[in-house]
Regions:
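Short glycine/proline- and charge-enriched loop/turn segments
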Residues: 20-29, 177-179, 230-233
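Substrate-binding N-lobe of the ribokinase-like
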Residues: 2-3, 23-90, 291, 295-300
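Active-site metal-binding loops of divalent metal-dependent hydrolases
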Residues: 9, 39, 248
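Positively charged, low-complexity intrinsically disordered leader regions
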Residues: 1-23
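Gly/Ala-rich phosphate-binding loop of Rossmann-like dinucleotide-binding domains
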Residues: 48, 148, 258
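Conserved phosphate-binding/catalytic region of the ribokinase-like
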Residues: 3, 163, 192-300
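Ribokinase/PfkB-type carbohydrate-kinase core domain
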Residues: 1-9, 69-83, 93-231, 292
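Nucleotide phosphate-binding site architecture
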Residues: 12, 184, 284
Length: 300
């Protein structure tokens, strides 16, 4: 069993500010960093640091070679990562004094994934393997359809949400991982926890995890025995940068599922990993290793 992440890789330009810039305003920044990022890259790093056997597929520009190096350094298999002509995907991130972030995303190389690359990559995977997806790459509906035909277990984190996701067949997914806003967007509901009822009625075989910020998270897992519902509290942390919180949670959660861990244990480990990540600046660089997560949990 392997995990394939067909995901984005970005260069993150991170600006520390007192508050988010307003329309028509020019704002001085306190500092600037250039860091590796992208939801796909972050989740692959989180999966690897959680102890998973993960492969990353996608595209990088000529200026993105250091992103491949970072994945390799973290034990991620990059055999399915392609270098293309053109600009690397990147983000412009404002981080305010409360640790909250505001992000502009330029797709670049992440929007250059071809059907030929998809076919070639998926040919190496099959039943029992996991596929992790986010909404920062092109051809997402095609990837889902082809992976489903190969019997893969598909996890989608539909972020950032846009209308293109309406072309994705959610009935072919094993898990949908969303925050409060995305839960409402995917279901059309006004309340995050009501979203489960709507999604379950449409896609009876779909399991859903909803992260609820400071209120923790809740998972609805559809199994052969019925429905398993688990709620997990959020661990307290002195946040300085929340950029990688969701991606860290996703990586540790999926890594736990792939290992066959109980659902409540997967959520507990993911919640602690996420709490640790927000105490550090940056995205991929803030993600803890499983040994640190387990040590912190043992202290509780």
């Amino acid at each position: 069993m392997r995990i394939l992440n067909f995901g984005s890789l970005n260069v993150d330009y991170v600006y520390s500010v007192e508050y988010f810039v307003r329309a028509g305003e020019t704002l001085k920044v306190n500092s600037r960093e250039v860091l590796p990022g992208g939801k796909g890259l972050n989740q692959s790093v989180a999966l690897a640091r959680a102890g998973a056997d993960v492969c990353h597929a996608g595209c990088i520009g000529a200026d993105g070679a250091f992103l491949r190096d970072l994945l390799n350094e973290n034990g991620v298999d990059t055999a399915y990562l392609r270098t293309i002509d053109g600009m690397q995907g990147h983000t412009i991130i404002q981080v305010d004094r409360k640790g909250e972030n505001c992000i502009l995303l330029y797709g670049g190389s992440n929007r250059r994934i071809s059907k030929a690359q998809i076919d070639e990559t998926l040919a190496h995977f099959g039943p029992g393997d996991w596929l992790v997806l986010q909404n920062e790459v092109n051809n997402l509906p095609l990837i889902v359809d082809l992976a489903s035909a190969r019997g893969m277990r598909i996890v989608l984190n539909p972020s950032p949400y846009d209308d293109g996701l309406k072309a994705v067949d959610f009935g072919k997914l094993s898990w949908l991982l969303v925050n409060e806003v995305e839960a409402c967007q995917c279901s059309g509901s006004d309340e995050p926890e009501r979203a489960w009822d709507v999604l379950h009625a449409r896609y009876p075989g779909l399991s859903v995890l909803i992260t609820l910020g400071s209120a923790g998270s809740i998972a609805y897992s559809v199994t052969a025995e019925g429905l398993d519902t688990v709620r997990q509290q959020a661990f307290q942390a002195d946040a300085v940068d929340t950029t990688a919180a969701g991606d860290t949670f996703t990586g540790f959660f999926i890594g736990g599922l792939a290992e066959g861990r109980p659902l409540d244990e997967c959520m507990r480990r993911a919640s602690m990993a996420s709490a640790i990540s927000v105490t550090r600046m940056g995205a991929a660089v803030s993600i803890p290793k499983r040994e640190e997560v387990e040590a912190r949990l043992a202290e509780i």
